[in-house]
Amino acid sequence: VWDFMSLVKALQIDLTSVKLPWTPTKDNVSRRLINEIVLGEESDIDQEENPTSHYELYLEAMETIGAKTDKIKKFVSNVIECNDYKVAVSKSDIPHAAVEFMNFTFDVIDTKKTHIIASVFTFGREDLIPDMFINIVKSLNEKPGSKTNDLLYYLERHIEMDGDEHGPMALKMISGLCGDDKEKWNDAVEFSNQALKQRIKLWDYISSQI
């Protein structure tokens, strides 16, 4: 969830004007799409209708079900202190599989190629989530309990936003970024496949620890 937000912000930096003095960017459609996505991911609402990010929603849900969150909190604290991803990782106790997954994300960001970043965001993350989360929600609903309420809310918000809004927006964005450029579409396929392989490796590790 944390490194997903870094992908989102990388796209916002590339597709919008975040420098002073402000000037309009060329791609009006992608500018609007990424700002809509950032609004939902960074400033959604919790169950009490308080503004919050999906990262914070997820963290709260994990704490409610009794999952340990000390390592991610320490890592983010290190990021704030160092303002450097690699230094923060070196100072944190993070499972190797999670580090490999995040390293891939930041390698993608470091390409500085917006269509590649967008393809990993779209096909490696955003487009997968609704179908994946629907099955988890079905499973949780079979065993209802107050401890899972926050997690259910988080999952259902993602299903609603990603399935109905963010998913279609992301597909429209990648289509606009790649256009008729065959090389860019080849990049999109290659990096999307790599992203999916990285996700499978991470899930396999998580499965081995359960």
What is each of the regions a protein language model found here?
Residues W2-I210:
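Non-heme di-metal
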